[in-house]
């Protein structure tokens, strides 16, 4: 195997969107074209029992939302494609943000009837901060939506990114006739037996259709006043190519995939803590853990650490260094995924995502290296939780299951765990309420451990250096606790309590995460 050639073939990207914009449906269609599934499951068809292939966890199937990041791989047109399907629900932004550290590009799915929504904007900011290319898919043209020119304007005004349309819709909703493909200079037809037609046939096909007349006017306007196409600007994350289509009816998706693979970047390097960038073509293997997922197969109570390979080649059975612990590990049992199905990996290269079976060795953010290399990659973002719950086992006889469940789910990063310094009580912190619901559901369903949870409300969280800590600093306005790394932390009742503490202990430095 020529490793250089293999790395060049890799295209690793995440799909981001606001909930219900059609992200899971487009993922299904891409897998369909990659030959990974015989039929694309649709998220809406819940009563039929046909669930989306990429939504594999029980609670995701019930609620029609993605709450974990799935990793899926397929080959298409000479490229090896790695898709990371991210949680669309805002409470799961932590998992999503970490996933965005493991990709080289993003596909942003927008509901053409709703335009840019809150969660899309949040996720776009992270992508923009990383400077990776963004490809936009304006979805749901099979329904009535906003004017295409207005949607482009929103991209520029709300997200601050220039856009270039690769195709243009001819009507929408019941009047949807197809797409005017600007890149391939052809018509893509929504109705009838023929899939494509030449531009010259447009007048003959659509006659005096007012929508087609509007398309010609719009394109003339874009040619005169629109942005210029620039591959350089796309790769720099300054220009987003825009595709229109309908994921539900699988229209425009294959054209999008083919053009996307032409312009999406090959694997990037990754920055070490000293600022130096590790090149993907370095012969030495390196990678980092961006996600840990327990119970992908509930029958085996397993745990998988997802690793983005940054450089070199993975070979089954290889030994790696874990610089955080100073110890080594052997990578014998390694898999790649198609949602819940998996297959053993013999080798993989930079740009690939592999799943390493984990018995408690790894943490999110860990670096893996080989030989004399003991460097660490830049830390992944961590987040300060905003709401808290006390948690305990409902049945004292189930303490063992309770502790195992908490340990595994906390290591995934789905919730954060704190322990009251004085009482030893467990407290959970999360970015949003849904995280607690998922935690409770999974504790009961996967660990057979019912839990009692009582709200503590919002808290303002600050870490304190162990050497600065005096237990007498604890008061009725704060709770002194330890995080899961045994670092001391204060949970303040509100900002006033925090200011009161800062005034009382002016020499004590408190730290806030992201």
Swiss-Prot record:
InterPro entries: EF-G-like_DII, EFG_III/V, G_TR_CS, P-loop_NTPase, PrfC, RF3_C, RF3_dom_3_sf, RF3_GTP-bd. SUPFAM superfamilies: EF-G C-terminal domain-like (SSF54980), P-loop containing nucleoside triphosphate hydrolases (SSF52540), Translation proteins (SSF50447). Pfam families: EF-G_D2, GTP_EFTU, RF3_C. GO terms for cellular component: cytosol. GTP binds at residues 17-24, 85-89, 139-142. CDD domains: RF3, RF3_III. It comes from the Bacteria. Belongs to the TRAFAC class translation factor GTPase superfamily. Classic translation factor GTPase family. PrfC subfamily. PANTHER family: PEPTIDE CHAIN RELEASE FACTOR RF3 (PTHR43556:SF2). This is Peptide chain release factor 3.
């Amino acid at each position: 195997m020529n490793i250089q050639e293999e790395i060049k073939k890799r295209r690793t990207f995440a799909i981001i969107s606001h909930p219900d914009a059609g992200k899971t449906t487009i993922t299904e269609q891409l897998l369909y074209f990659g030959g990974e599934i015989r039929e694309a499951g649709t998220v809406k068809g819940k009563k039929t029992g046909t669930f989306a292939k990429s939504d594999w966890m029980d609670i995701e199937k019930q609620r029609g939302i993605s709450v974990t990041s799935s990793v899926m791989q397929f080959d298409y047109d000479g490229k090896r494609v790695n898709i990371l399907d991210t949680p669309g629900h805002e409470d799961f932004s932590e998992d999503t943000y970490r996933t965005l550290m493991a990709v080289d590009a993003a596909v942003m799915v927008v509901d053409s009837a709703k335009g840019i929504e809150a969660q899309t904007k949040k996720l776009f900011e992270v992508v923009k901060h990383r400077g990776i290319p963004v490809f936009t898919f304006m979805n749901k043209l099979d329904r009535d939506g906003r004017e295409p020119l207005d949607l482009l304007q929103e991209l520029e005004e709300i997200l601050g990114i220039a856009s270039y349309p690769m195709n243009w819709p001819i009507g929408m909703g019941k009047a949807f006739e197809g797409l005017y493909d600007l890149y391939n200079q052809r018509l893509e037809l929504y109705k009838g037996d023929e899939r494509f037609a030449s531009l010259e046939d447009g007048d003959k096909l659509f006659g005096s259709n007012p929508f087609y007349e509007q398309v010609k006017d719009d394109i003339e306007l874009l040619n005169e006043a629109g942005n210029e196409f620039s591959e350089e600007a796309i790769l720099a994350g300054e220009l987003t190519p825009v595709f229109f289509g309908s994921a539900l009816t699988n229209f425009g998706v294959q054209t999008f995939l083919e053009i996307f693979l032409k312009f999406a970047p090959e694997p990037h390097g990754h920055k070490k803590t000293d600022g130096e960038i590790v090149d993907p073509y370095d012969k030495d293997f390196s990678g980092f853990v961006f996600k840990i997922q327990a119970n992908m197969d509930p029958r085996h109570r397993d745990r998988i650490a997802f690793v983005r390979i940054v450089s070199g080649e993975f070979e089954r059975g290889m030994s790696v260094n874990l610089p955080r612990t100073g110890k080594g590990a052997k990578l014998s049992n390694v898999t790649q995924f198609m949602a819940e199905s998996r297959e053993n990996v013999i080798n993989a290269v930079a740009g690939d995502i592999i799943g390493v079976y984990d018995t408690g060795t790894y943490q999110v953010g860990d670096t893996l290296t080989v030989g004399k290399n003991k460097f660490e990659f830049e830390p992944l973002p961590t987040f300060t939780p905003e709401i808290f719950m006390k948690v305990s086992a409902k049945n004292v006889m189930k303490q063992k299951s309770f502790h195992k469940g908490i340990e595994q789910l906390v290591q995934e990063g789905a919730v954060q765990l704190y322990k009251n310094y004085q009482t030893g009580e467990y407290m959970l912190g999360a970015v949003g309420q849904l995280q607690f619901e998922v935690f409770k559901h999974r504790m009961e369903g996967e660990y057979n451990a019912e839990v009692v949870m009582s709200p503590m409300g919002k808290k303002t969280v600050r870490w304190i250096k162990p050497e600065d800590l005096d237990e007498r600093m604890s008061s009725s306005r704060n709770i002194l606790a330890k995080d899961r790394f045994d670092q001391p932390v204060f949970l303040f009742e509100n900002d006033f309590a925090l200011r009161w503490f800062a005034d009382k202990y002016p020499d004590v430095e408190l730290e806030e995460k992201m």
